[in-house]
């Protein structure tokens, strides 16, 4: 790390029974995902992750082979994102599995992006599509209940490949940070979508002391996510707003930079920033404005 750079650090902990269910989570996928959720936080500051530490608390129900499988996923993510493991710890616990990863990155001070820089009239932009991870989780939980009532029943996972991958093996948006650098583009604020779009919009608006207009018909939702939401009698917009675990990037951009992102298939303009007094509002498909509500992840509810 160059002396002129700033160091960016993020830590995330994943606890069995709270953040993941071993009934349907392959250990290799879990190892991979545990790295991704940390790297995503670093990218959300427009920084580049360089190193991680990995700490585990493991109960006796896990074999050495199981631990190896978990680490295979960790190593796969590190290899893909060019990150080094520089340390960690491992200890026993009475039950379950807990994974704690700390990621360390760097960025020039002038390039750092926080949640607090959004200004009135900035564009509100999101990468990728939303709600897929949440609907993938719904499918897995449904099949778990079927299996519990009839262990001989094979899970019905056909036609759900995309949303299952969004849940079990997400990716971090390194490509977007590369695009920013190549385009000499700097968002005014940014956050990754771990707790749901609505929740992250509130974070940016609160830190930036601004309001927002979010347009329902602009929210990007994949066709598989949409159809699965309908099958579960869940409004697809609710899946996107409150589902979480998408690990896409939500950012604001000065309107003068619009031409640099125009036509980019990886980004969707979903609204704009307003004065704080105007509030945080969702403009529905019927062109009706209602205050946006955030019902994302609550760390103290299980």
What residue ranges belong to the model's regions?
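Helix-biased detector of long, well-ordered alpha-helical tracts
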Residues: 1-302
């Amino acid at each position: 790390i160059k002396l002129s750079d700033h160091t960016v650090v993020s830590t995330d902990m994943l606890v069995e029974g709270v953040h993941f269910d071993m009934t349907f989570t392959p250990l290799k996928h879990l190892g991979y995902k545990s790295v991704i959720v940390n790297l995503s936080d670093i990218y959300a500051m427009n920084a580049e992750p360089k190193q991680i530490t990995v700490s585990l608390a493991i109960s006796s129900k896990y074999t050495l082979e199981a631990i190896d499988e978990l680490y295979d996923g960790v190593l796969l993510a590190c290899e893909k994102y060019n990150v080094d493991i520089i340390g960690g710890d491992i200890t026993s616990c009475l039950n379950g599995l807990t994974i704690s990863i700390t990621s360390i990155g760097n960025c020039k001070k002038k390039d750092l992006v926080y949640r607090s820089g959004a200004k009135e009239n900035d564009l509100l932009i999101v990468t990728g599509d939303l709600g897929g991870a949440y609907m993938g989780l719904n499918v897995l939980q449904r099949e778990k209940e079927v299996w519990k009532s009839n262990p001989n029943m094979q899970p019905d996972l056909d036609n759900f490949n995309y949303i299952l991958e969004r849940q079990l093996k997400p990716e971090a948006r390194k490509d977007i940070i590369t695009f920013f650098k190549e385009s000499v583009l700097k968002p005014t604020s940014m956050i990754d979508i771990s707790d749901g779009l609505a929740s992250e919009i509130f974070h940016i608006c609160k830190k930036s002391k601004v309001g927002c207009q979010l347009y329902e018909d602009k929210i990007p939702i994949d066709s598989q996510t949409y159809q699965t939401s309908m099958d579960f009698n869940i409004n697809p917009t609710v899946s996107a707003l409150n589902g979480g675990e998408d690990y896409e990037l939500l950012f604001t951009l000065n309107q003068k930079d619009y031409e640099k992102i125009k036509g980019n298939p990886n980004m969707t303009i979903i609204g704009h920033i307003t004065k704080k007094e105007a509030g945080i509002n969702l403009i529905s498909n019927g062109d009706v404005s209602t205050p946006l509500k955030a019902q994302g992840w609550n760390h103290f509810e299980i």
